[in-house]
């Protein structure tokens, strides 16, 4: 679809097509769709391949849009805040616990009683990501929103509320559950009723089943493997537990409609107060070049000043896909990209978004920020961090280091934490390799345990498209066998590891006290869990 007035220049011209090709080649991305909204005009176009080897991307191609879903969640909550007839109890400053009661309990009593709707939507609850704590099996059934929300009580915060920006998918899962609890409806139906249908967004879905049932072309997500080289398909998965935090599937046409409605403040979607609320800054966020003023997070939107104009934006990344949406409200201008690789789609999308913004703002070519180089440097730093992990985490270990106390195969078993759930550690005897596979979690990952010294290990954490190295430690019980394992799964907690207790160990109650029953909600997690202080 290309719609424009006669005197409008097409920003998605042949010159831009060449820039897109170079960028996709640079980042090894099969395909991308792009939309530009400029006042009354909208342009959309597809580039490259939606599915290898020969299915082209078109403006109708569906992509997972990741965390850009959060904006729909905030928008719906703004409608409930406005609706004083049906939801008089729902205001931005309403404590979430007043609405969800025992389902929403945090590790500190003050937090439980005071964290508000506004707080959970602006990443200022004090709760870090805890990205590996949810999904998978919950007592024999797949994770529900309620399961995940109730598990939050067992997760430690890393800062006092309202002091620090900490991005949290978890809190948007809480927001999704809140919407379903208040409305009595599945959040996907609420999105469709309140936002998508009024805007004519008839190609936007919140489940893979619905997207497939539509009969519309769905892009395949990929992971580029430089060692082959080649592309590995990333399995398309339905992740209902991600919900309003990042489960949307849409195409570039529909996202152009969404961007247009936001720029025009369409009265058939949100109220004037609602539009103001979702874009009003709440939390100061880290900034970097080329931004020279403080950045902030509003309600599911980032706000920054660039070249003298305010940009409101958000990105979205999920296994095999990446989306960028950026709006300049003062100019009625927006750019959206959707592509089909993990991480690199966001790198390329950002570079192309700012290429078009720079053209709109007449920024001289020699004054434009090199986003491709910035992301290449970031990738290099992450690889260096993996390479240097042993020295970073264990700088004083002698060489040669003492071997593990036990044969590697003796560290296997089922380990458990009330929030992070079960971790089954296995031994590959042929390769003498200790590992765990959490492929069914919301963030699928594999952990490989590399011995460093005695019970101290490094864990190679592999997720789709990336890897990291984390310190880990086993603790031996009185009988000389492993009783628990600690992994630095949440870096925001500093040196505090997440401790998982080995199944069947009698020290379990001593470690977790009375918080084992996830349905009881009677005790909070200790501020820190140090079974043994070294």
UniProtKB/Swiss-Prot annotation:
It comes from the Eukaryota. It is an enzyme of class 3 (hydrolase). It holds the Pfam family Beta-lactamase. Pathway: Secondary metabolite biosynthesis. One of its GO terms (molecular function) is hydrolase activity. Its EC number is 3.4.-.-. Gene3D superfamilies: DD-peptidase/beta-lactamase superfamily (3.40.710.10). Keywords: Hydrolase. Hydrolase; part of the gene cluster that mediates the biosynthesis of the unguisins, gamma-aminobutyric acid (GABA)-containing fungal cyclic heptapeptides with the amino acid sequence cyclo-(D-Ala1-D-Val2-L-Leu3-beta-MePhe4-D-Ala5-D-Trp6-GABA7) for unguisin H and cyclo-(D-Ala1-D-Ala2-L-Leu3-beta-MePhe4-D-Ala5-D-Trp6-GABA7) for unguisin I. Within the pathway, the hydrolase ungD' catalyzes the hydrolysis between the D-tryptophan and GABA residues of unguisins H and I to produce the corresponding linear peptides. This is Unguisins hydrolase ungD'.
């Amino acid at each position: 679809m290309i719609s424009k007035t006669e005197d409008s220049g097409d920003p998605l011209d042949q010159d831009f097509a060449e820039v897109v090709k170079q960028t996709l080649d640079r980042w090894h991305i099969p395909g991308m769709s792009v939309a530009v909204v400029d006042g009354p005009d909208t342009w959309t176009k597809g580039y490259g391949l939606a599915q290898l080897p020969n299915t082209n991307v078109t403006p109708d191609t569906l992509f997972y849009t990741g965390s850009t879903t959060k904006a729909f969640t905030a928008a719906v909550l703004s409608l409930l805040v406005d609706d004083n007839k049906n939801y008089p109890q729902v205001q931005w400053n309403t404590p979430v616990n007043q609405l969800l009661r025992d389902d929403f309990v945090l590790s500190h009593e003050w937090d439980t009683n005071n964290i508000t709707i506004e707080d959970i939507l602006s990443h200022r609850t004090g709760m870090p990501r805890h990205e590996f704590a949810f999904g998978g099996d919950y007592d024999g059934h797949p994770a529900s929103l309620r399961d995940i929300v109730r598990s939050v009580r067992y997760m430690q915060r890393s800062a006092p509320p309202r002091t620090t920006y900490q991005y949290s998918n978890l809190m948007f899962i809480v927001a999704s559950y809140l919407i379903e609890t208040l409305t009595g409806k599945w959040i996907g139906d609420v999105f469709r009723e309140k936002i998508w249908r009024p805007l004519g967004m008839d190609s936007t879905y919140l489940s893979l089943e619905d997207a497939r049932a539509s009969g519309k072309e769905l892009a395949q997500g990929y992971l580029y493997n430089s060692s082959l080289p080649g592309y590995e398909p990333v399995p398309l998965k339905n992740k209902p537990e991600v919900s309003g935090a990042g489960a949307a599937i849409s195409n570039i046409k529909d996202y152009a409609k969404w961007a247009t409605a936001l720029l025009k403040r369409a009265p058939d979607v949100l109220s004037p107060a609602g539009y103001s609320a979702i874009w009003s800054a709440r939390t100061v966020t880290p900034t970097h070049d080329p931004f020279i003023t403080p950045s902030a997070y509003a309600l599911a939107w980032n706000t920054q000043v660039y070249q003298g104009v305010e940009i409101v934006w958000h990105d979205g990344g999920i296994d095999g896909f990446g989306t960028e949406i950026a709006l300049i409200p003062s100019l009625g201008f927006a750019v959206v990209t959707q592509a089909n690789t993990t991480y690199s789609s966001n790198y390329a999308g950002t570079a192309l978004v700012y290429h078009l913004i720079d053209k709109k703002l007449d920024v001289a070519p020699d004054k434009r920020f090199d986003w491709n180089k910035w992301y290449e440097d970031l990738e290099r730093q992450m690889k260096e961090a993996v390479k240097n992990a042993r020295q970073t985490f264990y700088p004083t270990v002698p060489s040669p280091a003492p071997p593990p106390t036990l044969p590697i195969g003796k560290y296997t078993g089922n380990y458990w934490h009330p929030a992070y759930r079960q971790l089954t550690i296995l031994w590959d005897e042929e390769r003498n390799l200790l590992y765990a596979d959490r492929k069914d979690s919301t963030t699928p990952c594999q952990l490989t345990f590399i011995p460093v010294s005695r019970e101290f290990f490094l864990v190679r954490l592999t997720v789709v498209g990336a890897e990291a190295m984390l310190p880990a430690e086993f603790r031996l019980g009185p009988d000389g066998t492993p009783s628990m394992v600690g992994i630095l799964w949440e870096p925001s907690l500093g040196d505090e590891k997440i401790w998982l207790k080995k199944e069947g160990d009698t020290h379990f109650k001593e470690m977790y006290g009375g918080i084992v029953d996830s349905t009881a909600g009677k005790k909070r997690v200790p501020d820190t869990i140090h079974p043994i202080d070294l």
